[in-house]
Amino acid sequence: NGTIDATGATITGFPEGGLKLISSVTNNSSVTSIDFTNCFSATYRVYYVVIASLPVASAQEIRAVIGNSDFSSTDTFQNVLAQWDVGENFAYRVSTGVAYIDLNNTGGAGEPPSIQFTLFNPFSSVERTQLLGQSSYYRTSGGTYSLGQLASMSDGTVSRTSLRLNCSSGNLGSSSYTARVSIYGLAES
């Protein structure tokens, strides 16, 4: 149904798929959480989140919380985090019925983790929310650099609009690093 005007070299009427930036923040201070309220909608089914250099307190995890606009209601999840480190060690963690998704495993305060994940169907009231992702971090327990593979599925099918990043204990962020967190929606047509 689209047309191409060769004289003006403009393209009109074609679908514009791809990643569309929804929100991006930088942080270089200690905070209890980084909130993206009302970032999920019926516009997209799939979201891509990038977290660059976000420090945590020593031996803590960065957690994702999926909830309504004021986080008074949040989803519970079944989570798997598999981890490989440079010492050729493998470990994994499993959690069920928890109101968060661990994005790294006992990260170090001096080396900020970087994380990327894809979130499927957070706004759907029919399909469960699912998460797949990777994280790169320095693991305090064991003192090694690690790669984490993440997988998670919500226990229910409630429409959610917001994402919160917080720490398993203590604060996120540091004046020593400027972290950036960006959320993109995947336009499918």
Predicted ranges, named:
Residues 1-18:
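Intrinsic low-complexity, repeat-rich intrinsically disordered segments enriched
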Residues 14-189:
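Surface-exposed molecular-recognition determinants
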